[in-house]
Curated annotation (Swiss-Prot):
[4Fe-4S] cluster binds at C190, C193, C196, C257. It catalyses: a quinone + succinate = fumarate + a quinol; (R)-malate + a quinone = enol-oxaloacetate + a quinol; (S)-malate + a quinone = enol-oxaloacetate + a quinol. Component of complex II composed of four subunits: the flavoprotein (FP) sdha, iron-sulfur protein (IP) sdhb, and a cytochrome b composed of sdhc and sdhd. One of its GO terms (molecular function) is ubiquinone binding. Binds 1 [2Fe-2S] cluster. This is Succinate dehydrogenase [ubiquinone] iron-sulfur subunit, mitochondrial. It is found in: Mitochondrion inner membrane. GO terms for cellular component: mitochondrial inner membrane; respiratory chain complex II (succinate dehydrogenase). Its cofactor is [2Fe-2S] cluster; [3Fe-4S] cluster; [4Fe-4S] cluster.
Length: 284
């Protein structure tokens, strides 16, 4: 009895005798690709910072792993996930979106603060890729930094719309012109990954007092929002010698930002606003 086999061609069903091997186009493609999987291994070494606070006496160290790039995705985060899934389940790091949106996988890779999900693996097999947690932060475990202080500073600037007349809150929209909305471009895109703040020497030295580039850029974002009524009050909170003025325009923040933003410029704009604010305050 003849069998009915559906072909990938548009000519409809094709009758074939039983026992005759049928090879679909996808199988042919897989067969053609087979030699590639047998290519010579490309072994890449990753030296990763390790420290486990739950192990008494454990000291920070670098642990080396070898990954075949032929069997790994192209990004550093792909390598970390492969290491954790297939070699060492104790390796700890943060990650979520895998597309440069959430900021979770911020770490120091080959000397620069960046996102592991958006940085390609250096394919030079003679070089060891070195991965550390964000610098000058307390470490929770391995590549996980403690961001408690960073988030507390962000909370302190009240990063939300504030209105002095709240009678219409929830009843109508707070409209904004196209021109005023355009002023927020390059500011609202910040994902709070902390790459910029942890690359700033001033923040290393005064993290308990200096707000740092990420938080200051968000402070500026709300200061210039035409819908916000608390610009003067926001400026007043930065009057002390440390919150704002520890910025020495080193510009590491702008160089390292994985989103291509310019926190240094935002801080400079706040300083300009502060000058006019002081003049207004003195005249009162």
């Amino acid at each position: 009895m003849a069998a009915v086999v559906f072909s990938l061609r548009r000519s409809g069903p094709v009758f074939r005798l039983p026992g005759v091997l049928q090879v679909c186009r996808g199988a042919q493609t897989a067969a053609a690709a087979a030699p590639a999987s047998q290519a010579e291994a490309r072994i890449k070494k990753f030296a990763i910072y390790r420290w486990d606070p739950d192990k008494p006496g454990d000291k920070p160290r670098m642990q080396t792993y070898e990954v075949d790039l032929n069997e790994c995705g192209s990004m550093v985060l792909d390598a970390l996930i492969k290491i954790k899934n297939e070699m060492d389940p104790t390796l700890t790091f943060r990650r979520s979106c895998r597309e440069g949106i959430c900021g979770s996988c911020a770490m120091n890779i080959n000397g620069g603060n960046t996102l592991a999900c958006t940085v390609r693996i250096d394919t030079n097999l003679s070089k060891v890729s070195k991965i550390y947690p964000l610098p000058h932060m307390y470490v929770v475990k391995d590549l996980v930094p403690d961001l408690s202080n960073f988030y507390a500073q962000y909370k302190s600037i009240e990063p939300y719309l504030k209105k002095k007349d709240e009678s219409q809150e929830g009843k109508e929209q707070y409209l904004q012109s196209i021109e005023d909305r355009d002023k927020l471009d390059g500011l609202y895109e910040c994902i709070l990954c902390a790459c910029c703040s942890t690359s700033c020497p001033s923040y290393w030295w005064n993290a308990d007092k200096y707000l740092g580039p990420a938080v200051l850029m968000q402070a500026y974002r709300w200061m210039i929002d035409s819908r916000d009524d608390y610009t003067e009050e926001r400026l007043a909170k930065l009057q002390d010698p440390f919150s704002l003025y520890r910025c020495h325009t080193i510009m590491n923040c702008t160089r390292t930002c994985p989103k291509g933003l310019n926190p240094g410029k935002a801080i400079a704009e706040i300083k300009k606003m502060m000058a006019t604010y002081k003049e207004r305050a003195a005249s009162v």
